[in-house]
From Swiss-Prot:
GO molecular function, one term: RNA binding
Listed Pfam families: Ribosomal_S9 (PF00380)
Disulfide bonds: none
Magnesium recorded as keyword: no
Sorted UniProt keywords: Ribonucleoprotein, Ribosomal protein
Source superkingdom: Bacteria
Gene Ontology annotations of biological process type: translation
Protein name: Small ribosomal subunit protein uS9
Record has Disulfide bond as a keyword: no
Family: Belongs to the universal ribosomal protein uS9 family.
GO cellular component, as recorded: cytosolic small ribosomal subunit
NCBIfam families for the chain: PRK00132.1 (NF001099)
């Protein structure tokens, strides 16, 4: 019999993560690497594991994620979003818990565009009175 896999997409900033969740023993693989290899910082690993830790399903599912775009922080957020969405597909009773924690909401914060006449989005050129 084919193994059940739950697929979900997660997004954060400019990163997009495709996440497959299947019953297993808790392996998390990101872009064909172990999560520990791919995310060098402990804070990023914690972010990725948050939905599993909150729902107490850390050792019950294997996660395979393919993530593109953005930096490591955005990618970690995208994987977290994808895992949370996939968990809801796997077990709809987890939805209220994940919703309350805010893991099912796409974080709308994006980089503000640079404006002409300014150095960055808000940074004005240095002003000299004399």
């Amino acid at each position: 019999m084919a193994q059940i896999k739950y697929y979900a997409t997660g997004r954060r900033k400019t990163s997009v993560a495709k996440v497959w969740l299947s019953p297993g023993n808790g392996k998390i693989i990101v872009n064909d690497k172990n999560m520990e290899e791919y995310f060098p910082l402990e804070t990023l690993r914690i972010i990725v594991k948050q939905p599993l830790t909150l729902t107490e399903t850390l050792g019950k599912y294997d996660v395979i994620a393919k993530v593109k775009g953005g930096g490591l922080s955005g990618q970690a957020g995208a994987v977290r979003h994808g895992i949370a969405r996939a968990l809801v597909l796997a077990d709809p009773t987890l939805r209220p818990v994940l919703k309350k924690a805010g893991f099912l909401t796409r974080d709308p914060r994006m980089v503000e565009r640079k404006k002409y006449g300014l150095k960055k989005a808000r940074r004005a050129p240095q002003f000299s009175k004399r």
